[in-house]
Regions:
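Long amphipathic alpha-helical coiled-coil segments
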Residues: 34-46, 82, 89, 93, ...
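Short, charge-rich amphipathic alpha-helices with coiled-coil/heptad character
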Residues: 1-43, 96, 103-104
């Protein structure tokens, strides 16, 4: 009987080991998939940040043109006032709205990167959970400076 119990125990333990190995392989696959997604998101984030810098540069140029046009003393009248109003309100407002929308996209990308990183951290036990909390706080801080 002892051999039969030992054999059953070995079979049960072998099944558990197989189950743990499958779980580990699945977690490693999820981890690798998340890392690939994070890499693509970081590339997109860099491209969008570069676009934002370009738009901000265009907005600065537009503001300079608007100020120079406003300072021009050779042209006066209602048409000049209409054009100045359009330049200073409509166009500048549109630039600011566009930049704010880019910021919202960057924040969303940062949130998704953090979510994926935290998923990976949480596979590492209690230290991973603590690291995920710190990572979330760091993300909120980083978004303030977008």
């Amino acid at each position: 009987m002892s051999n039969n119990n030992n054999e059953q125990l070995r079979t049960a333990l072998g099944a558990q080991v197989g189950q743990y190995e499958n779980e580990r392989a699945w977690q490693q696959q999820c981890y690798a998939e998340n890392e690939a997604k994070i890499s693509r998101l970081q590339e997109a984030k860099q491209a969008i940040q570069q676009s934002k810098e370009n738009v901000e540069a265009c907005a600065d140029v537009w503001k300079t043109i608007s100020l120079n046009f406003e300072a021009d003393q050779d042209w006066e009248g209602a048409h000049k006032n209409d054009i100045l109003n359009c330049m200073s309100t409509a166009v500048e407002t549109d630039y600011n709205t566009y930049i704010s929308n880019i910021d919202a996209v960057l924040d969303a990308i940062c949130d998704e990167i953090t979510r994926l990183e935290n998923e990976n951290w949480k596979t590492m036990g209690i230290i991973g959970h603590l690291s995920a909390l710190i990572n979330s706080l760091w993300n909120e801080n980083s978004k303030l400076f977008n």
